[in-house]
Structure formats: structure tokens, C-alpha cells
């Protein structure tokens, strides 16, 4: 049986792992086995947290809208219900930005809803 030299393939695979873990501390970026484990863990965490970020931002927007709505004397769920009934198409991100940066505009929207 002939000898198989697979240095290039193995080196390429290891290099990809070390590139992924280049900013990690200590053995997590120096030793292949621990770097491989930490790289897989980092990729799994980043995948999970991309969806978690969307969830967290939506919660933040709802909290901001609720606070601004209660300052105008209405609860969050009544506000959303009235927005749909009056066919005002503003998503939660835009409503939160308006509530945070332009309270006069938000008050105008509230008056439009309550008519």
C-alpha cells in the first residue's frame, strides 16, 4: 500500500479552525483540540443569539411603546388594537423610535387613534 501524504488538506482544515478562533485567549486559540471545541461552541452560540437578539429587541420596543402609551393614558394592547382597527401600518420598531425621539408625533398618532 502506498503512503498517503495529506498534509495540505489537514493543514487547511486546522488553519480554518485557528482563523475562526484567532481572538480567543490562551489554549483556546493555540491548541487544535480546544480551539476546535471552542470554535464549535462559539458558532452554536452565535446562531442561537441571532434569534435571541430579535426576541430581545422586540421586547425592548414593546416596553418603550407601553411606557409612552401609558403617558398618553392608554395601555399597550389597546394601542395596538386601535392601530389595526384604524389601519395605521406602523410596526413596533417604528413606533418605539417615534415614542423615544418624537413625543409630539406619538401624541398626534394617539389622537388620531382615539377619534
Curated annotation (Swiss-Prot):
GO biological process: ribosomal large subunit assembly; translation
Pfam families given in the database record: Ribosomal_L20
Cell compartments where the protein resides: Plastid, Chloroplast
Keywords: Chloroplast, Plastid, Ribonucleoprotein, Ribosomal protein, RNA-binding, rRNA-binding
Keyword Ribonucleoprotein among UniProt keywords: yes
Entry GO terms, CC: chloroplast; ribonucleoprotein complex; ribosome
Entry keyword Metal-binding: no
One GO molecular-function entry: rRNA binding
InterPro entries: Ribosomal_bL20, RIBOSOMAL_L20_CS, Ribosomal_protein_bL20_C
Primary subcellular site in the record, as a coarse category: plastid
SUPFAM superfamilies assigned: Ribosomal protein L20
Family, as annotated: Belongs to the bacterial ribosomal protein bL20 family.
Role: Binds directly to 23S ribosomal RNA and is necessary for the in vitro assembly process of the 50S ribosomal subunit. It is not involved in the protein synthesizing functions of that subunit.
Protein's UniProt name: Large ribosomal subunit protein bL20c
Lineage summary: Eukaryota, Viridiplantae, Streptophyta, Embryophyta, Bryophyta
Gene name, Swiss-Prot/TrEMBL: rpl20
